[in-house]
Amino acid sequence: MSILVAYASRHGSTQGIAERIAERLGAHGLDAEARPAATVRDAARYDAFVVGGAAYMFHWLKDASAFVEHNRALLAERPTWLFSSGPLGMDTVDKQGRDVLETTVPREFADLRAKIHPRAEKVFFGAVDPAARPVGFAERIVSLMPAGKDAIPKGDFRDWPAIDAWADEIAHDLGATGPAMR
């Protein structure tokens, strides 16, 4: 079984998650590869899909959304999972006591859920390299504001055991048996 882990990443955090998922699926004996969503022109050759994108201001990166929209008929008929990365920091609940991962689901997921019926969706914490240069207008503006510099937590907040566990669930859903071999 051939699995594509397509991703849209601005600073590399989501790419790292996608590569880890593909590696973990491979450790279960599945043929999986991670590729930037914008570069995929041959989606029909894959049997299953995991599509991920970074989320900013409750929106998935456009390359992830565009990949799903362009391939929606194919994704609707084959096993598909969606993920997002983006929440930053160590807090798992917000000031109102709500689960951060549940309240940061990209707005696009509701529409995509109706169109392609993914088997599951997941939100993972992301990462921000303090040395990374801002990308895009909004990031540049926030980085120039005195309060903006401290408003965004810096560091790697990705939960690798949670990412591995989700990849293991996907592998088992696709018929892989036993634990990951790597």
Show which residues each predicted segment covers.
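Generic anion/oxyanion-binding catalytic loop in active/binding sites
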Residues: 3, 53, 152
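Short acidic low-complexity segments
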Residues: 34-44
